Amino acid sequence: MYKTKCLREKLVLFLKIFFPILIYQFANYSASFVDTAMTGQYNTMDLAGVSMATSIWNPFFTFLTGIVSALVPIIGHHLGRGKKEEVASDFYQFIYLALGLSVVLLGMVLFLAPTILNHIGLEAAVAAVAVRYLWFLSIGIIPLLLFSVIRSLLDSLGLTKLSMYLMLLLLPLNSGFNYLLIYGAFGVPELGGAGAGLGTSLAYWVLLGISVLVLFKQEKLKALHLEKRILLNMDKIKEGVRLGLPIGGTVFAEVAVFSVVGLIMAKFSSLIIASHQSAMNFSSLMYAFPMSISSAMAIVVSYEVGAKRFDDAKTYIGLGRWTALIFAAFTLTFLYIFRGNVASLYGNDPKFIDLTARFLTYSLFFQLADTFAAPLQGILRGYKDTVIPFYLGLLGYWGVAIPVATLFDSLTDFGAYSYWIGLIISLIVSGALYRWRLTVIMKRFESLAKSKR
């Protein structure tokens, strides 16, 4: 990160940060995409099992990665104030925090998840695949969270290309392990859909090993003196949790409501479950665009706010939101035209393809709502405003999605589509609430700047 002098320099810097994050996010979401697509080609029953498992896994995992992502605004403010010597200390505190959170998530997966899966009315074969998938996936919990901390460090330093290169390794690693374990290639035991969980875990262990080597060999990071081990500092841990808990809670509130809808789908047929999950999976892949804008906004805004250049932060906000709209125009057009082709990536049954394509039509409205709401979350994190957005997200997602969806399901014949309608409306409401909060925060900082002149 560096100070910019004009709009053109800001645009160039923003895009330099954004594009590597975008590629990183695509690579990140590709792990789930590869698991779902390869399992769908194996058979629909295993796909239904994996979809139920990810409905439980995603909320808890994203909650914890949301907590450790608080490292980005913390380091951003240090850099904006010229306190680079504080970076290494905060990095190690978040490493310790990630290890502790790994134990929490492991306990949830091993003890809580099977109980949920066995009490939601799933077919026995589907439940068996889901439980085995989660157990295998739990092997990769530690590298998943530790890599999230390393990635947050690199992003906050503006080294988003390095994050991108590391994450690009995930796709071939995950695909290779999945091929071996799902289909039982080259004499490896055939594990079916559950093998996708083990494939992802092994891929992340390899990725973590490579990332640690890069961390201590990269010239640009040597000035941080990361080789010096720093002891646990409970004050900094508490600060990280205080800032990160609302971030994780906001992400959890959004992802969990999608997952609850996925679990509600258990009352429908295996075909509907598989089609719903496939459409939702591709929607998540497309979410990489607004999510990347959000991450880039958190980096640039936190840097400018830390340096007390509030007008520059405001300029970046405009650039980010316009970038989100431009990309949305392309992704919406692509998905509308090729929704049938996209559906065929997940299976070859004509009924499955037709049903998935219908769900994908609803996902167009997801993308439109996310284009508005997601960047606002990143902007608010850049201002270190996380507590109120958490409550707003809770209200927007849980106060709207499930009640509206249940109402549509009861009063209309929309069936499974009712729950997509509820989710779309909740995203729109949440976006409006975030926009209101940003207006309040920006006025507060403008008043602060005027009072110090």
Swiss-Prot record:
GO terms for molecular function: antiporter activity; xenobiotic transmembrane transporter activity. One of its GO terms (biological process) is monoatomic ion transport. It is a multi-pass membrane protein. Signal peptide: none annotated. It holds the Pfam family MatE. Keywords: Antiport, Cell membrane, Ion transport, Membrane, Transmembrane, Transmembrane helix, Transport. The keyword Cytoplasm does not apply. One of its GO terms (cellular component) is plasma membrane. It is found in: Cell membrane. The chain crosses the membrane at residues 12-34, 54-76, 96-118, 128-150, 162-184, 194-216, 243-265, 285-307, 319-338, 358-380, 387-406, 416-438. Multidrug efflux pump. Belongs to the multi antimicrobial extrusion (MATE) (TC 2.A.66.1) family. This is Probable multidrug resistance protein NorM.
